[in-house]
Amino acid sequence: MPRVFTGLPANYAAPTLALSLLLPLLLVVWTQLPVSARPSTGPDYLRRGWLRLLAEGEGCAPCRPEECAAPRGCLAGRVRDACGCCWECANLEGQLCDLDPSANFYGRCGEQLECRLDAGGDLSRGEVPEPLCVCRSQRPLCGSDGRTYAQICRLQEAARARLDANLTVVHPGPCESEPQILSQPHNIWNVTGQDVIFGCEVFAYPMASIEWRKDGLDIQLPGDDPHISVQFRGGPQKFEVTGWLQIQALRPSDEGTYRCLARNALGQAEASATLTVLTPEQLNATGFSQLQSRSLFPEEEEEAESEELGDYY
């Protein structure tokens, strides 16, 4: 007499049957989504969240490495997927990750990275710390391209993004460099009696000193002029220094070209900006629309901010 199993309910269906019914439903939902809501065709790590949601509830099939798709655009390296079979892109620095090694929703951090709770939020306002990938080392490094990188993780990202550059570590610590002006002073105009400020941000190693000068004067500002002041501070990043020149209660004689000069033992760099001073009568007679070309130049600001992309920070 055949053996009868009575421990399962009559309407029990095998998991594979449930999945076979669920997948067509997911396909219908997918086709109804707007294009903007679908995952992009970018690097694999950008699509992984969608793939995990679609695969939720599925078990691991027998591992067939020859059927695995090759991951691409993996700037943080590769890790095995939840089933330990195929390779997938590891998470980058700053991306969400799984604190529990047995979990696999957000994904695993890449080479030289570890998953830590981000304590930078404001807990008093109810912000919940999030697990993020953090580089194990925070020591700056000098790359073979002559650039200084904040730590090994940034250098490895750059190396994987530019494979033909053969980027390697030359030595720990920053590269020795003559001053590089990261943020230049900008041309500006204002009315007599008002205040203006020029700023200048410099990266260098050894550290640079900054001074301000005005064309036509042989002295370093502020000199003995009580309505001109200068200020300096370190930062905003390592091996950077920022200087400001403030002119209070503008006078017509303040008009001219001002220069930020940065020096260290390896060399110097400079950047200039023009100050135009108008009287109220000139402003009314000229009209603001005609002065826009002599105001701040957005194109110069964008160029200054993009000059050192990829370097250090």
UniProtKB/Swiss-Prot annotation:
Organ and tissue specificity: Highly expressed in the spleen. Moderately expressed in the skin, lung and urinary bladder. Weakly expressed in the brain, tongue, esophagus, stomach, large intestine, liver and bone. Expressed in osteoblastic cells during bone regeneration. Expressed in secretory osteoblasts in the tooth.
Coiled coil: none
Induction: Up-regulated during the early phase of the bone regeneration. Up-regulated by BMP2 during osteoblast differentiation.
Kazal-like domain span: 127-177
Stretch forming the signal peptide: 1-37
Any one Gene Ontology molecular-function term assigned to this protein's record: insulin-like growth factor binding
Swiss-Prot/TrEMBL keywords: Developmental protein, Differentiation, Disulfide bond, Extracellular matrix, Glycoprotein, Immunoglobulin domain, Osteogenesis, Secreted, Signal
UniProt record, GO biological process: cell differentiation; extracellular matrix organization; ossification; regulation of cell growth
Region (Disordered): 290-313
Annotated glycan sites: N166, N190, N284
Subcellular location: Secreted, Extracellular space, Extracellular matrix
Bias type Acidic residues, positions: 298-313
Keyword Glycoprotein annotated: yes
InterPro entries named among the record's database cross-references: Growth_fac_rcpt_cys_sf, Ig-like_dom, Ig-like_dom_sf, Ig-like_fold, Ig_I-set, Ig_sub, Ig_sub2, IGFBP-like
Keyword Iron annotated: no
Domain Ig-like C2-type: 179-276
UniProt domain IGFBP N-terminal: residue ranges: 56-136
GO cellular component: extracellular matrix; extracellular region; interstitial matrix
Principal localisation: secreted
One of the Pfam families matching this protein, by short name: IGFBP
Cystines in this chain: C60-C83, C63-C85, C68-C86, C74-C89, C97-C115, C109-C133, C142-C175, C200-C260
Function: Involved in the proliferation of osteoblasts during bone formation and bone regeneration. Promotes matrix assembly.
Protein name: Kazal-type serine protease inhibitor domain-containing protein 1
Native organism: Mus musculus
Gene giving rise to this polypeptide: Kazald1
